[in-house]
């Protein structure tokens, strides 16, 4: 693991929080609670200590991108039209990517006045349940072959070139793409793309999703902690599904606790852990920034690519 981080500056929490002058946190604890994943934990001091310095760094990266585009336009002797600043957020299932992404969306929108900040998840680019079932890929859901990567790359290419797009929407409740529902993305100043697969090797070996990113962030944690968080999340999903027969997880609520635990542990080991070890974690060093979370969900180390 040490060799993997040779090209990164390791910064501890105490040092990182000093890299941004103390300002008023631009959201309340109730707002924070409303955007966090239901099995995640985050307090306002995490916003102040970790995320405000991170937004400051995003400002630096964005300015560098704009300066480069301006210089390129002088070199090419033509105008380069404005492009959205695209941020990729990756990491394991249950590690807290969604909380990080939603929080960044709010903080960026409130830091860059008048900026339009959109967030999409790659869940919307999963193949529909029926397609996965037909191809016998239900046990590979979340693996590279379960996504329509061409559609994802086509979306990013269109957005980068100034086109409006409509993309599918995924529901964890029905465990499938929602029929006849789309998310419209129109001329964002910032676009956050969150998903377990955003740094992975392309199927055609020529074009990476991450080729479109101006900044990439990997949310990391020790495997044993992620497993605990996953099992907690599975149990909470069942609690939410208890009175909803249409919820995918409702079928598990009729089982005994040992049966439920066995299913959750097997799903973690055979699907999520296997996917993490083979496809997700090996892409970690492609990130510009790695946020490492401790057992209490707080970020204790930050790795910044040199």
UniProtKB/Swiss-Prot annotation:
Annotated ATP binding sites: 91-98
Report the top EC class in one word. Answer: transferase
User: From its record, what is one biological process in GO terms?
Assistant: coenzyme A biosynthetic process
Q: Which SUPFAM superfamilies does the entry link to? A: P-loop containing nucleoside triphosphate hydrolases
Naming one, the record's GO cellular component terms include: cytoplasm
What InterPro entries does its record include?
P-loop_NTPase (IPR027417), PanK (IPR004566), PRK/URK (IPR006083)
UniProt keyword terms in alphabetical order = ATP-binding, Coenzyme A biosynthesis, Cytoplasm, Kinase, Nucleotide-binding, Transferase
Can you say where in the cell this protein is located?
Answer: Cytoplasm
Tell me which Gene3D superfamilies the record gives: P-loop containing nucleotide triphosphate hydrolases
Pathway listed for it? Cofactor biosynthesis; coenzyme A biosynthesis; CoA from (R)-pantothenate: step 1/5
Q: What is its EC number?
A: 2.7.1.33
Disulfide pattern: none
What catalytic activity does the UniProt entry give for this protein?
(R)-pantothenate + ATP = (R)-4'-phosphopantothenate + ADP + H(+)
- Gene Ontology terms for molecular function: ATP binding; pantothenate kinase activity
Q: What is its main location?
A: cytoplasm
NCBIfam families, A to Z:
panK_bact
Please give the family membership noted in the entry: Belongs to the prokaryotic pantothenate kinase family.
Protein known as: Pantothenate kinase
């Amino acid at each position: 693991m040490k060799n993997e981080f040779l090209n990164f500056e390791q910064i501890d929490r105490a040092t990182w929080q000093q890299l941004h002058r103390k300002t008023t946190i631009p959201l309340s604890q109730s707002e924070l609670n409303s955007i966090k994943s239901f099995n995640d934990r985050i307090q306002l001091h995490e916003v102040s200590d970790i995320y405000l310095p991170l937004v400051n760094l995003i400002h630096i990266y964005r300015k560098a991108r704009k300066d480069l585009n301006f210089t390129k336009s002088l070199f090419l002797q033509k105008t380069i039209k404005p492009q959205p600043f695209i941020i990729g957020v990756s990491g394991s299932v249950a590690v807290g990517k969604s909380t990080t992404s939603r929080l960044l969306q709010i903080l960026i929108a409130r830091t860059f006045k008048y900026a339009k900040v959109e967030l999409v998840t790659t869940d919307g680019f999963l193949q529909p349940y029926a397609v996965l079932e037909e191809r016998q890929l239900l046990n590979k859901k979340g693996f590279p072959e379960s996504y329509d990567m061409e559609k994802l790359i086509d979306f990013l290419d269109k957005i980068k070139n100034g086109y409006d797009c409509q993309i599918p929407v995924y529901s964890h409740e029905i465990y499938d793409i929602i029929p006849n529902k789309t998310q419209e993305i129109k001329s964002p100043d910032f676009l956050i793309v969150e998903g377990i697969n955003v740094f992975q090797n392309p199927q055609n070996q020529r074009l990476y999703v991450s080729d479109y990113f101006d900044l990439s962030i990997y949310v990391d944690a020790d495997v044993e902690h992620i497993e605990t968080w996953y099992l907690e999340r599975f149990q909470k999903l069942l609690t939410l599904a208890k009175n909803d027969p249409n919820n995918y997880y409702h079928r598990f609520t009729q089982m005994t606790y040992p049966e439920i635990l066995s299913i959750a542990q097997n799903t973690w080991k055979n699907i999520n852990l296997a996917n993490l070890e083979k496809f997700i974690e090996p892409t970690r060093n492609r990130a510009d920034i790695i946020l490492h979370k401790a057992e209490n969900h707080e970020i204790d180390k930050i790795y910044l690519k040199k």
